[in-house]
UniProtKB/Swiss-Prot annotation:
Protein name per its UniProtKB record: Protogenin
Extracellular side, ranges: 24-943
Region span, Disordered: 975-1010, 1079-1191
SUPFAM superfamilies named among the record's database cross-references: Fibronectin type III, Immunoglobulin
Alphabetical GO biological process terms: negative regulation of neurogenesis
Native organism: Mus musculus
Coiled-coil positions: none
GO molecular function: identical protein binding; signaling receptor activity
Record function comment: May play a role in anteroposterior axis elongation.
Cytoplasmic topological intervals: 965-1191
GO cellular component: plasma membrane
Biased composition (Polar residues): 977-990, 1135-1146, 1171-1180
Localisation per UniProt entry: Membrane
Domain Fibronectin type-III per the UniProt entry, residue ranges: 415-509, 511-607, 612-711, 718-811, 816-911
Length: 1191
């Protein structure tokens, strides 16, 4: 049971259990800024006062201002801001001209951290309109159903009641139902219900009455016949806001009176808690929620039959926005990137927008908005602010906030200065700057930022440069465009401020494409050529001239007409009737003429075609990348009759499609299934029964399917599965895959490559390719590189892919091994040694040694040895005396093999050569004519070696003899111990007078055990410190401070006497209260039958040396429990007592845990339990060797 909580501790516990305020999404700490109260929608009458709440909390001072419809609201005598931030309007004014207090209000709270904007509050005046629907007079048979309705619009919604003959109609009767929607239902009508009815609509400030409608009762027949149920008032589709009340009307007639029931079309159950039936079948839903939305079915059924009829209505529930993901506050360094994510839901779907310190953010340059995300690139100190995500729809608005904190580095460099730009061409601008005045020596890189100066939603581009340059040419710019530039300097701890912005304009260029022309004929001898201006992105400057060229299709002579750039049509006159003319146009800027359009053909009408229809006025408009809208108008003054139209179209350079026959009433046609970014030629003509009319020709181009400039498109995902493999010491092969969810056509890829840990940004390598693989060359050998890839699609760039690391192969050794020496160490064996090739970057994995005698060398026969790269020596064996050997070495790795060293010669002299001629000639790798590496061994050296070897062999022989002697002594001791150990020990009860017999036994045991002294240090560790007193299972241990000696250096007889006396002294003192004492079987007072039941101290426990329950000493002292004796004397004793092998104990195999068989507590032969012993039995952990000796 949990302990009770004291009343005084409850607030403290609640405080501890509550999460920190700043950890809840959308809630901030009190030191910053948030709203405790926000303004709410209000409806008031004219001249009434109103208060809109606004209470902000945070670190002061806090200033509150108000906005009305997005503009700052000025205070006056009638409109004041209270001390708590609320807005007070003493008299609300209605519309007077353009002045009105109605509108949307928001409060803006500002402190040192930034500013936040409240949600919108709609202030409306109470109004009411005239009746839109009045009750209508009706006649009803007695016993039938009467229904009246009225409708009126008001703010707030009016309460509608009914009057009968100018008096309030009671609705307490079961057969009378008044619906809130303005419907009156009367069932089972009688003569008393006849009269005049009207509805009354009332609001908080207004009241209106409708026109009267009369109810006439017609006498019913005496006998009423059966008729099918009929729904006379079916439910209507309803759209309601959250928490409103909805009424679905369903009124039916029939005989017998039908029964009305409700269900949902999706077979879901109807909410019984908020739903009830009003009157005789109307469904009313109070406190509407989202789950109430759906299709409701009203069913009218004749009782006792299967005759029924149904009616359905849809209930749509609108909901204000609500957040499902809130933006989180961020801390970012200068020049970093911040991403805020905000998602909201509602019905209809809310529109998302972002605010910075209460002001709306527009996507441009560094700041981009992608759906519900806000991305801020190249963060600057001015970006430190409070950001709000606002979601709004027709039901309201909601805001969430987050703060961006920009971290500033104290020793960051100052901004680059004296930035100036110079136009180089129509697509290139030279940008130059001066290094920062402060901390310029710490600059590691510069970044150049540029974007278009005009328009919105312009993309900002960035180029990273090294710290060794202060100028850069930016190319691939659009001609005749203004660009804005700025520079940022980078250091390891952060970035500088932005430099001053400079703006520069690129030069003009020739037009990128010609105008699209339209050709029509007004008579048989003319052609009207018209064209549209070239779009700005293709114009590339100001068009100053149009050159119009035309010719007959059967002639080569071209006629040219030049027109000013302000003209967009021209009439070619004096042409031949019924002839095909080819027309083209070229536009020119001040730089020169651009590309000419293709020849467009047009046939002039026949000269006799007096009754031919005139050409229609044709207009072409691309609807999307695959569809063109064709519109035309026919001249209303054309006297010729028109039967229809013929439409032809073709792609430039392809065959013509058509004709497509259209009716005379058709003035619109859509061409679909076209290809994007293609030019199409369309011609249209009217025809009648006699002949075809004049045709109209026009060209148009379909746009691309992805328009990046006109709408924001999120960037594509990065490439994935990037794989790197070293190809050579200077190249690495890269392979990757395009994103799985990208359907756009990839333009190219950019590969970023740089060594790991690069400090100089100018050394970053950027490569372009259109393939999904690339061989990166020109790399440094044996260097680790990092690689990343990004793709580019329609002027969009993906993020960089995850980085992949890979090292180039080491370079093949460029030099041979150095310091090659050859030494003859035996008559037929030589030692070759060398050093690795020079150069710190050289990696060697293998050495190749070639050697041969001069005869074999002449024949080209080499003997080959291989050694690993870590070995720098080798033995040359089986050399033949009397020959001169040539040796050379090379180094290699997985890339290749390096050159061989200079040959080194070694002369192997014959055995009968004189001592005076034993020194051979030397030749090293630097001089192939001199013998090298042969070290002469004279007589003195050989004598020293022989003496050393003799001493070593003597020592080895002595050690072998000692080991043989000790081995024999152990075998003898084992046999004696086995004989004496067959008789069990019993508890000691002898007195001091019996010490002589015990002394004999101990002396005999000592003689047996003295050869078992282990030559090992004491393993007892007193981990806790303390005195020198050591206690084990045999009592206190008397420390022997005498110097230890090896057995074969001591006097054996003297040892026996001293040890016998010492054993006797200890044996006399064995008995202690509560202690188990072990004595030999000859002095045991127990009978032979009893001794068999004694547990042997070490016999049973030896079966479990690691986990014995009796090894408590190890827990107390930190010892392992195997040895706890300090001196050789105690080791002797334990050896004597435990010399019996464990298998001699009949109880040893009966307990796997090493414990003795249980005995009665009163048995004198039973050892006391472990918890009653005065000393821990640390000796229980002794292990035995195969011969039975303790280890």
């Amino acid at each position: 049971m949990a302990p009770p909580v004291r009343p005084g501790m409850l607030p403290l516990l609640l405080l501890l259990l509550l999460p920190p305020l700043g950890s809840v999404p959308g809630v901030w700490s009190f030191s910053e800024l948030f709203f405790m109260k926000e303004p709410q929608d209000a409806t008031v009458t004219r001249k009434d006062p109103v208060v809109l709440d606004c209470q902000a909390h945070g670190e002061g001072p806090i200033k509150v201002t108000w906005l009305k419809n997005g503009a700052k609201l000025s205070e006056n005598k009638r409109i004041q801001v209270l001390s708590n931030g609320s807005l007070y309007i003493s008299e609300v004014e209605g519309r007077r001209g353009e002045q009105s207090d109605e509108g949307f209000y928001q409060c803006l709270a500002v402190n040192k951290y930034g500013a936040i904007l409240s949600q919108k509050a709609h202030l409306t005046l109470s109004t009411i309109s005239a009746f839109e629907v009045h009750p209508v007079s009706t006649e009803v048979h007695e016993g039938g159903v009467a229904r009246f309705s009225c409708k009126i619009s008001s703010t707030p919604p009016a309460v509608i009641t009914w009057e009968f003959n100018r008096t309030a109609l009671p609705t307490t009767m079961d057969r009378v139902t008044a619906l809130p929607s303005g419907v009156l239902q009367i069932y089972d009508v009688g003569p008393e219900d006849a009269g005049n009815y009207r509805c009354v609509a009332a609001t908080i400030a207004h009241k209106r009455k409708s026109m009267e409608a009369s109810l006439t009762i017609v006498a019913a027949n005496e006998t009423r016949s059966f008729y099918m149920p009929t729904i006379i008032a079916s439910p209507q589709n309803v759209t309601a806001s959250l928490h409103q009340t909805v009424v679905l009307e369903c009124m039916a007639t029939g005989y017998p009176r039908p029964i009305i029931s409700w269900s949902r079309l999706d077979h879901k159950s109807i909410d019984v808690f908020n739903t009830r039936v009003l009157g005789n079948g109307n469904l009313i839903i109070s406190d509407v929620k989202l789950q109430h939305a759906g299709v409701y079915v009203c069913r009218a059924t004749t009782p006792g039959t299967r005759n029924f009829t149904v009616a359905m209505a849809t209930l749509t529930v609108l909901a204000p926005p609500s957040f499902v993901e809130w933006p989180e506050s961020l801390t970012r360094p200068r020049a970093g990137t911040a991403r805020f994510v905000c998602q909201a839901e509602g019905i209809p779907s809310p529109k998302m927008s972002w605010l910075k310190n209460g002001r709306r953010i527009h996507s441009n340059g560094r700041i981009k908005m992608y759906n519900s995300k806000l991305v801020i690139n190249q963060i600057i100190p001015e970006d430190d602010a409070i950001y709000q995500c606002m979601a709004e729809n027709s039901q309201g608005s909601v805001l969430s906030r987050a703060r961006l904190t920009v971290v500033m580095s104290e020793d960051r460099p100052s901004a680059p200065y004296n930035v100036h730009a110079e136009t180089m061409s129509s697509s290139a601008i030279l940008l130059a700057w001066e290094r920062p005045l402060y901390n310029s020596d710490k600059v590691i890189a510069y970044s150049v930022h540029y974007m278009k100066a005009e328009g919105l939603n312009n993309e900002e581009y960035q180029v990273v440069l090294g710290n060794d340059t202060t100028h850069y040419i930016i190319d691939d710019l659009e001609p005749d465009s203004n660009y804005t530039f700025y520079i940022v300097a980078y250091m390891p701890l952060g970035a500088s401020q932005m430099s001053d912005h400079v703006t520069q304009n690129t030069l003009e260029d020739v037009p990128l494409r010609p105008p699209e022309i339209s050709l029509t004929s007004r008579s048989p001898t003319d052609i009207l050529v018209s064209w549209l201006p070239i779009p700005a992105k293709y114009r590339r400057g100001q068009v100053v001239l149009y050159r119009l060229s035309f010719r007959l299709s059967t002639e080569n002579a071209i006629q040219v007409v030049e027109l000013p750039g302000t003209v967009h049509e021209y009439l070619l006159e004096g042409l031949k009737p019924d002839s095909v003319y080819l027309v083209r146009i070229t536009a020119a800027t001040r730089v020169g003429l651009g590309e000419s359009s293709v020849w467009t053909s047009h046939r002039t009408p026949k000269a006799t075609s007096v009754k031919a229809p005139k050409s229609p006025e044709l207009h072409l408009e691309p609807l999307n990348c695959t569809t063109i809208s064709v519109r035309w108008l026919q001249d209303t003054e054309d006297p010729a009759a028109i039967r229809g139209y013929k439409l032809f179209y073709k792609e430039e350079g392809q065959q013509e499609h058509g004709p497509i026959f259209l009716d005379t009433g058709d003035l619109l046609y859509t061409l679909s299934g076209l290809d994007p970014r293609r030019k199409y030629h369309v011609r249209l003509l009217a025809y009648n029964n006699m002949e075809e009319g004049y045709q109209a020709d026009q060209t148009v181009s379909t746009p691309g399917c992805v328009s990046v400039r006109d709408r924001m498109v999120p960037p594509p995902p990065p490439p994935h599965h990037l794989y790197a493999k070293a190809n050579t010491s200077s190249s690495i092969f890269l392979h990757w895959r395009r994103p799985a969810f990208t359907t756009a056509q990839v333009i190219n890829y950019t590969i970023r490559c740089n060594p790991v840990g690069l400090q100089n940004a100018s050394l970053v390598l950027y490569l372009q390719t259109s393939e999904t693989h690339m061989l990166v060359q020109g790399l440094e050998p044996n260097t680790k590189y990092e690689f990343a890839v990004r793709l580019h699609v329609d002027q969009l760039s993906s993020p960089w892919s995850p980085v992949v690391y890979h090292s180039t192969l080491p370079e093949a050794p460029t030099g041979p091994p150095v310091g090659v020496k050859v030494t003859l160490i035996e008559d037929d064996t030589a030692l070759v040694s060398w050093k690795p090739p020079d150069g710190p970057e050289t990696v060697v994995t293998r050495y190749t040694i070639l050697y041969a005698s001069r005869k074999a060398w002449i024949a080209g026969e080499w003997q080959v040895l291989h050694r690993e790269g870590a070995i720098t020596m080798a033995l040359l064996e089986n050399l033949v005396a009397g020959n001169v050997y040539i040796v050379k070495i090379s180094a290699s790795n997985e890339v290749g093999e390096g050159p061989f060293s200079n040959s080194v010669e070694l002369a192997v002299l014959p055995k009968d050569a004189s001592e005076s001629n034993q020194r051979p000639k030397r030749l090293d790798s630097s001089n192939a004519k001199v013998y090298s590496g042969y070290y002469h061994l004279d007589q003195k050296s050989m004598t020293g070696i022989a003496v050393g070897v003799g001493i070593a062999l003597t020592c080895i022989l002595i050690c072998v003899l000692i080991l043989i002697y000790r081995s024999k002594a152990r075998k003898s001791s084992a046999s004696k111990t086995a004989q004496s150990g067959t008789q069990p020990l019993s508890q000691a009860s002898a007195s001091v007078a019996a010490g002589s017999d015990m002394g004999k036994n101990l002396e005999r045991a000592t003689e047996t055990a003295e050869s078992l002294v282990p030559m090992m240090p004491s393993s007892f560790i007193d981990a806790k410190g303390g005195t020198d007193l050591i206690i084990n299972s045999y009592g206190p241990i008397i420390k022997n401070n005498t110097k230890k000696k090896w057995l074969f250096f001591q006097d054996t007889k003297k040892i026996k006497v001293e040890q016998t006396q010492r054993r006797f002294t200890q044996a006399v003192c064995f008995y202690q209260p509560g202690t188990t004492v072990l004595i030999s079987d000859e002095d045991s007072p127990g009978s032979p039958g009893q001794t068999a039941s004694f547990p042997r101290p070490f016999g049973a426990t030896a079966l479990d040396t690691e986990h014995s329950a009796n090894s408590e000493g190890s827990h107390e002292t930190g010892d392992s429990g195997r040895f706890s004796h300090e001196s050789n004397d105690e080791i002797h004793l334990s050896s004597v007592i435990s010399s019996t092998p464990p298998t001699s104990n009949p109880l040893a195999g009966g307990d796997s845990d090493g414990d003795a068989a249980p005995k009665k507590h009163g048995d004198p032969a039973q050892p006391l339990p472990a918890e009653q012993t005065s000393a821990p039995q640390t000796s229980a952990g002794l292990r035995y060797a195969a011969e039975g000796f303790p280890v």
